[in-house]
Swiss-Prot record:
It is an enzyme of class 2 (transferase). This is Error-prone DNA polymerase. GO terms for cellular component: cytoplasm. The gene is dnaE2. PANTHER family: DNA POLYMERASE III SUBUNIT ALPHA (PTHR32294), ERROR-PRONE DNA POLYMERASE (PTHR32294:SF4).
Length: 1024
């Protein structure tokens, strides 16, 4: 224990530090350091990760919390936290400095430094003549807590700098401490540090010149090297400073906001009061005894764990949403809580699922419960601003999300830093198949022409591998709020988000969980927006007011389930994906709980655990159902003896192996990370022995453990599925009974779901719904329903669909539109201020009432050409100098302007033009026999590569009659890589496979027909 490193920047000093906090703390422990201070620049974003690594690896090294600052280019220093007061002070200083600037910047003031009362200050002389001035100033205000930090990096001026620092220390009576200025945990990271510096400066490594580190001395160094560089007293001083720093992150305590409690109530009694009121609402005919017992058990544990404020906070937020007419739904493990149901946080009746409160709160786990609440995605901002207004920005902020380098950004940024041409990087990225899990991207790069033996090629691959996973910047969490009783900046630094009126803390959800700090998840869901808009449309056109509760009371509508069983579920929540639609005709959901199973079973967990086929066989009566005991039957009876849900695994561990609720939840957590650390295997002996002691066969015990491992990190909770099933049924019901309203609502709620507006419009047309084009005289901003002379409702497309049309342009167009409509294009031109707006309208053919075709409309848009000198010298021309666009050209223009076309489908159009060979259409596949050879052609509208599919990719092709499911095996994708990666219009020759009503085409040959489209097709949606 010879040394404490007091100045060390991790990769949370973005594009400066070249090692993760975890790597630094582990290496410091390996080298025998007494302490390590993670001191990122004006940031505490990396400290929790180092703290967690110490616990996980049981390290002896001590972590010191601190931060590095630049007051300006001439004054730099490190602040360290000796105690809790100093930590609060540091958080406040970082917050103030960050809040003064835009995201990613900070500005420290001299007053910030002068007002320090608790932090220890290590001044880092720059070697400039101004050092004496700064030493004078710092000594005047911080003499009692001030050290001079001496760094030695073996540069050409090292001896001069050493003498300079010693002179300053003697002159101002400053103790000297050794400092490393560490940027890397090992010297081998120097090339990566150079690369990060080049990225930061926007140049190549070769262009950095003197900005490059001259050596790897800014890594964690050995005792032998440090003793050569620093005097013993300077090393000893680092240990003395470390001895002053007793602050530990575990000492942080979260205090809940208290203003929600009315006079005369305690937090416990007020929660009980609200639950009592909720019981009357949720159970008007009386609370069943079993439910009442569960409520009392939950309330007792909530009180014991001191969580009433948490539940009251969530209740307050959802009540605000309810009062404002904002649809919401609690989900996740909260659906395991009857208290949450009574508080109207969740909508899943506990009598409909197997409630497992241990999944929600556990005494042994001793950490805050997790309640996710989804709000309409277009109105969630109202909820967020309510939280800010109620608690103030000093007490409420969003959690951070760490945006890290992923493959594409890593390749592009590293390549630029190494001087690789951007065209070559584009070529690499376009032609690397990341879905191919056997032929890694490294090997594919070599195939594409990268020279692996060249120095640049070796560096490129190594640097890309190293930088993937490195943090790039902090972004805002999708909705995780941290709300505190006192100023939040005394708990964690707060900074500005990129979005206006948003602030974020410097920790992400994993950091908060590690420190057992509470966050409230205020999430968004597009389907809730679509459902509300659908309800409003139904009320407008049918004078019927509906709610989600009204629809869920009709959960046994077999007409809806017949539609679901046919996989007619495009646009339906959670059961619209390719995999779900393939399963629906096999599982044939016929009730609400079937939907709960349907949503959960099409997940990697049940698939990897080999639970899907046994369940389907038992459901179809092809396999007997048996249980080794009554206790196991109680757990698995609803899923026919096959564990489908996480909760069932937990319950099995409890009833069959004697696990406590907390131990079983620890098993669940180990399941979630077993591939990373293998912790699940430490439960194997206890699980199997516990089952053997209770009379179960070894074969059964081992099979259960194998299924647990199969669940792995993909196990799906019944509570999640139950919440999702409510919206799945609701959206299916709306699609069945009010299809026009449903499709209009979906189109007006984009972006959301699996399908593009083009695909939704095609599906609406297949359901017999007329879709009308955008019209300057009849369209609104959003898509709307209009009644035809036949009495049927049709969808009129809205201006929001037009690319390049500004919001201001739409507003002016609608505000000034005469009652009788616009009579000529020049009238519109006088209203719209931006030329691009009127050009966009013409390109989208929105003037079809005022001009014969879009080409003529464009010409009229440019009718001021005669005023230009060049055109005044030309002879006059007719008013209609251009030929009409062909049908094919119109389709091209439609896609370019709006992303969809109401004209004939491109496949049908190309066939009529003789551009396609003979093929089978989507609606003809059901007439083909099993294992027959077929040829299909369609626009590539979707690709999915599930992590458990062993390299298989599922394509969705769309022709003029419907969608075609294509399975592409890995060998096929490798052999025909170009067509696989880039085709937008694809011909597939393959074998048709039929299983009941499920039809797939197993691809044999892929033929890229994209050139026939000439830019026609919409880009496919790809899901990994």
């Amino acid at each position: 224990m010879f040394y404490a490193e007091l100045f060390c920047q991790s990769n949370f000093s973005f594009l400066t530090g070249a090692s993760h906090p975890e790597e630094l703390i582990v290496q410091a422990n390996f080298l025998g350091y007494h302490s390590l201070a993670i001191t990122d620049e004006c940031s505490l974003a990396g400290i929790v990760r180092a703290h967690s690594a110490i616990k996980q690896h049981q390290l002896s090294v001590k972590q010191i919390v601190g931060s590095f600052f630049k007051l300006n280019t001439e004054c730099q220093f490190v602040l360290l936290c000796p105690n809790r007061e100093a930590y609060a002070e540091l958080c406040r200083i970082i917050t103030n400095a960050r809040r003064r600037c835009e995201k990613g910047q900070y500005q420290l003031s001299q007053w910030d430094v002068m007002s320090l009362k608790h932090c220890l200050l290590i001044w880092l002389p720059t070697g400039q003549t101004s050092d004496e001035q700064w030493a004078t100033w710092l000594s005047r205000y911080q003499q009692s807590r001030l050290w001079l930090g001496l760094q030695r990096h073996l540069r050409h001026d090292d001896e001069h700098y050493l003498h300079h620092c010693q002179t300053l220390a003697n002159q101002f009576d400053l103790p000297i401490t050794a400092c490393g200025g560490v940027l890397m945990h090992r010297p081998e990271r120097l090339p990566l540090q150079h690369t990060l510096t080049a990225i930061r400066h926007g140049c190549t490594v070769e262009q950095l010149g003197t900005q490059l580190l001259t050596n790897a001395e800014q890594s964690l160094r050995s005792e032998k090297k440090l003793r050569k560089l620093f005097k013993p007293q300077w090393l000893a001083e680092s240990l003395y400073i470390a001895s002053l720093c007793s602050f530990d992150l575990d000492s942080l305590r979260y205090e809940y906001p208290s203003e929600l409690i009315p006079d005369g109530y305690t937090p416990d009694s007020y929660l009980e009061h609200l639950v009592e009121q909720g019981k009357k609402l949720r159970f008007p005919e009386g609370v069943p005894d079993a439910i009442e017992q569960t409520i009392q058990k939950e309330l007792a544990l909530i009180k014991e764990q001191k969580y009433p404020f948490f539940f009251l906070t969530i209740h307050d937020i959802v009540m605000f949403a309810k009062q404002q007419g904002i649809l919401y739904q609690g989900r996740g493990s909260a659906a395991n809580s009857v208290v949450c149901y009574c508080l109207q946080i969740t909508s899943v009746d506990p009598r409909q699922i197997a409630v497992l409160f241990e999944r929600f709160i556990s005494k042994e786990r001793d950490e805050p419960p997790d309640i996710d609440v989804d709000f309409e995605h277009e109105r969630r901002e109202e909820v967020i601003q309510y939280i800010y207004q109620k608690y103030g920005r000093q007490r409420a902020a969003l959690a951070a999300t760490v945006i890290s380098y992923r493959f594409k950004s890593a390749v592009r940024q590293v390549g630029k830093a190494l001087g690789i041409e951007e065209t070559q990087l584009d070529f690499f990225l376009k032609n690397i198949n990341r879905r191919d899990r056997q032929a890694g991207w490294q090997a594919q790069l070599v195939e594409l022409g990268l020279q692996p033996d060249s120095l640049k090629g070796q560096h490129f691959i190594q640097l890309v591998e190293e930088i993937i996973g490195f943090p790039r910047h902090l972004s805002q969490h999708v909705g995780g709020f941290v709300i505190s009783s006192g100023p939040l900046y005394e708990l964690v630094p707060v900074e500005n988000a990129a979005m206006p009126e948003r602030t974020i803390i410097q920790w992400d959800k994993d950091d908060l969980e590690s420190l057992k700090l509470l966050k409230v998840d205020v999430l968004s869901l597009g389907m809730l927006t679509a459902i509300r808009k659908c309800f409003l449309s139904i009320e407008q056109h049918h004078q019927q007011r509906l709610s989600i509760a009204d629809i869920t009371r009709r959960q046994d509508d077999q007409a809806v389930y017949k539609m679901i069983q046919k996989a007619d579920t495009i646009g339906v929540f959670q059961i619209e994906s390719r995999a779900q639609m393939s399963m629906l005709p096999r599982l044939k959901p016929a009730c609400y709980y079937d939907l709960v199973i349907q949503i959960a079973i099409v997940r990697p967990g049940p698939i990897q655990g080999d639970m899907v086929h046994p369940f389907l066989k038992r459901r179809d009566g092809e396999e007997p159902i048996s249980y080794p005991s009554v206790h196991v039957q109680e757990v698995l009876e609803r899923t026919l003896g096959v564990p489908i849900f996480q909760e069932q695994v937990i319950k099995l561990a409890m009833v069959a192996a004697g696990f406590s609720g907390g131990e079983a939840d620890q098993l669940r957590r180990a399941m979630a990370a077993w591939k990373k650390n293998g912790h699940v295997f430490k439960f194997k002996t206890k699980l199997i022995n516990g089952m053997l002691e209770r009379g179960y066969e070894l074969d059964f015990a081992e099979r259960i453990f194998e299924q647990i491992c199969g669940f792995g990190e993909y196990g799906f909770p019944e509570s999640h599925s139950a919440s999702f099933a409510v919206l799945a049924y609701c959206s299916a019901w709306l699609k069945h009974y009010y299809p026009a309203e449903f499709y209009t609502a979906l189109l007006n709620s984009q972006p959301m779901g699996f399908y593009s507006p083009s695909q939704l419009v095609q599906d609406a047309k297949r359901h017999g719904i007329a879709v009308l084009p955008i019209c300057v005289n009849f369209s609104n901003a959003e898509h709307q329903l209009v009644r035809l002379t036949s009495g049927e409702l049709a969808i009129r497309l809205g201006f929001n669909l037009i690319k390049g049309l500004s919001h201001e342009g739409i507003t002016r167009l609608l505000t000034h539109r005469p009652a009788q409509g616009y009579q000529c294009i020049s009238e519109v031109k006088q209203i719209l201020r931006q030329a691009k707006d009127i050009q966009s309208l013409a390109s989208a053919n929105a003037f079809y009432q005022l001009a014969d075709n879009r080409y003529l409309a464009r010409w009229q848009v440019m009718d001021n050409l005669d005023e230009l000198p060049l055109f005044q010298t030309l002879p006059s021309i007719s008013n209609n100098p251009l030929p009409k666009p062909s049908d094919y050209q119109n389709v091209l223009e439609d896609y370019a302007a709006t992303g969809l076309s109401l004209a004939e489908h491109p496949v049908a159009m190309l066939e009529k033009a003789g551009g396609l060979t003979r093929f089978t259409r989507a609606n003809q596949l059901n007439q083909c026999s099993h294992r027959s050879l077929v040829t299909v052609i369609g626009l590539v509208t979707g690709k999915q590569s599930p992590g458990t599919a062993a390299g298989v990719t599922f394509f969705t092709l769309e022709d003029d009659t419907g969608n075609i499911n294509v399975v592409v095996w890995q060998a096929t994708s490798r052999a025909q890589k170009q067509a696989y990666l880039t085709a937008r219009l694809l011909m597939v020759k393959g074998i048709l496979e039929r299983e009941g009503d499920v039809i797939h085409v197993i691809a044999g040959r892929l033929i890229d027909l994209t050139e026939k489209l000439s830019g026609l097709s919409p880009k496919s949606r790809e899901f990994h």
